[in-house]
Structures are given as structure tokens and as C-alpha cells.
A protein has these predicted regions:
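Active-site mouth loops of central-metabolism enzymes
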Residues: 10-32, 81-90, 118-122, 144-146, ...
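Catalytic alpha/beta core domains of metabolic enzymes, predominantly
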Residues: 103-228, 239-240, 244
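Alpha-helix-loop-beta-strand connector modules within alpha/beta enzyme cores
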Residues: 8, 55-81, 129-138, 190-201, ...
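N-terminal small/glycine-rich loop or linker at the start of catalytic domains
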Residues: 1-22, 105-116
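Conserved, mostly hydrophobic/aromatic
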Residues: 30, 37, 48, 104, ...
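Active-site beta->alpha loop and helix N-cap motifs at the rims of alpha/beta catalytic domains
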Residues: 57-123
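Glycine-rich, proline-tolerant flexible connector loops at the mouths of alpha/beta enzymes
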Residues: 18, 43-65, 174-175, 179, ...
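Histidine-centered catalytic micro-motifs
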Residues: 8, 27, 31, 44-54, ...
Length: 274
């Protein structure tokens, strides 16, 4: 079977040091985590950045420092976030693209994050989506189409049809967000059936769903995402380190008779030109 690409999402926008001391929030911490995760089998790092108060930021200088330090220490594929959970302007969300990442996330729909108190609306208008897609296309940055539900996949296909995303496209199927598609085998099979025939896909399971979604993705021929962005626990009551989650994912894939790709092999699988 084809090799598995492991993406590490070490930081995200939510967990803070008060939640877990293991979440990396500074450029140096993120670069160190990137190095440790590459040693355990990761090929891609999905980068969110924080300011000095641990708040999510799209500041170019912070992303520039973080990306440069990751590249200095690793051969990982760098994927920057273009998240707009905090209601940022489109131009602000595009700032990380100036760091010339290999890939960038492109969320193709809006949803309520009802698991937070108070709840948050993650807004992605069609104008925002196409704005970011055009920026990525112009900069030769491969989008990772981030789908929190089935309709997000259809919007991703629409981008392909309009020439704003080149084929073969890559999708990240985020399962188990409170407000998104529930993390079940039936739902994962259904959403995969909506993908273009030549697309690649990865699966991210949120919280307790991370491990079972890892198993299902490997069995279905997909790739997997792990990390403290999605789940801060290794097991019930035991806080995880990012590199531990990568090591478990690598072991899991091996037990299911799929080897883990190197970063260069992942570049070939995803047809990255950078």
C-alpha cells in the first residue's frame, strides 16, 4: 500500500500553557517541536502562531521567524494556517502566505464552534475563500482544502472547477468538531465519496476521536493528522506531547501494514513543486 503522510498540528488556536505545558507557542518552541516530530515520522507541520500573550496571530514577523526556524532545523513540508476564527480581515489572514510556505490551509465554509463557551462562528465567505485561493495560486502554494463537513468538500470541488485550485487537490477532513461532521465511520466514508477521484486526503480527529480516526484513515488509504491543536491527551487523563502522538501514529500505520513517508516522499505524493 502507498505510504502514509503524517501531519503534525502542534499549536492551533485554542490550547494554552494553563491547559497543557506541552503546547509550543513561541517560534523557538514550535521549531523544537518540529524537529522532534520529524524524528518520529512527521512529514508536514501545520503552523499556527501566537503572540506574547499566547493569543492567535497572523502577524507576518512572527510567522516569518517561526517558518525560518522550522526550515533551519528540519526538512518538513511547511503548511501555514490562514485561520479567521478571530474575525480577522482577509488581508490579515493572508499574511502567513508571505513566508512562502509549501502549503497553506484553505477552509471552504463557515461553522459554529459550539464546543467553546461562548461559542465562536468561524466565518469563511465565498469572497474570502476565493481571495485566499487566488493568493495561493499566484504564489505557487498548494492549498490544503480543510473540510469540517460534506458541503465544504463541494465548495472545494467548485474551486477546482473554476481553476482556483489545481489538481490533484489535497483535502483535510476534520472529524468530530462540535458544530461540524460527527466522527463516525459512516460519515468518513460518505465524505470521502464526495472527493474528486484523483484527490489525496488526510483525516484529523478531534479530541477523543483522534486515535479512531487515525485508524480509519490508514485503513481507507488516506493520510493522518495528529497534534495538540486537535487533542491534548495521549489517553484519558494523561497529557500528550506532540512527538508522542506522531510516534503512536507511525507505530499504528506500521501495524496496519503501511509505511510512513519521509518529507521528500510526501512531496512526491502531493506533487509539490517547492
Amino acid at each position: 500500500m502507498k505510504k502514509v503522510i503524517i501531519t503534525i498540528a502542534p499549536t492551533g488556536s485554542v490550547p494554552r500553557k494553563k491547559d497543557t505545558p506541552h503546547v509550543p507557542t513561541t517560534p523557538d518552541e514550535i521549531a523544537e517541536t518540529a524537529y522532534l516530530c520529524e524524528q518520529e515520522g512527521a512529514s508536514i507541520i501545520h503552523v499556527h502562531c501566537r503572540d506574547e500573550n499566547e493569543n492567535p496571530t497572523s502577524d507576518y514577523a512572527v510567522f516569518r521567524e517561526t517558518v525560518d526556524k522550522i526550515r533551519k532545523r528540519t526538512n518538513l513540508i511547511v503548511m501555514t494556517s490562514t485561520s479567521g476564527v478571530a474575525g480577522k480581515l482577509d488581508e490579515d489572514r493572508a499574511q502567513p502566505l508571505r513566508t512562502e510556505p509549501d502549503m497553506a490551509s484553505l477552509t471552504t465554509g463557515s461553522l459554529n464552534f459550539t464546543g467553546r463557551k461562548p461559542s465562536i462562528v468561524y466565518v469563511n465567505t465565498w469572497e474570502t475563500i476565493t481571495f485566499l485561493a487566488k493568493k495561493m495560486l499566484e504564489a505557487n502554494i498548494k492549498p490544503e482544502i480543510e473540510a469540517f463537513d460534506v458541503g465544504f468538500v463541494r465548495q472545494g470541488v467548485k474551486l477546482i472547477e473554476q481553476g482556483l485550485v489545481l489538481e490533484p487537490a489535497h483535502f483535510q477532513l476534520v472529524m468530530g468538531v462540535d458544530g461540524g461532521i460527527p466522527a463516525t465511520l459512516e460519515n468518513l466514508m460518505h465524505i470521502c465519496h464526495q472527493l474528486p477521484p484523483n484527490a489525496t486526503f488526510s483525516v484529523a480527529g478531534i479530541a477523543k476521536w483522534q486515535l479512531p480516526m487515525n485508524v480509519m484513515a490508514v485503513l481507507m488509504g488516506g493520510h493522518i493528522r495528529v497534534g495538540l491543536e486537535d487533542n491534548i491527551y495521549y489517553s484519558k487523563g494523561k497529557l500528550a506531547r506532540n512527538e508522542e502522538l506522531v510516534a503512536r501514529a507511525r507505530h499504528l500505520a506500521g501495524e496496519l501494514q503501511r509505511e510512513v513517508s519521509s518529507p521528500n516522499e510526501a512531496r512526491q505524493i502531493l506533487r509539490l513543486e517547492r
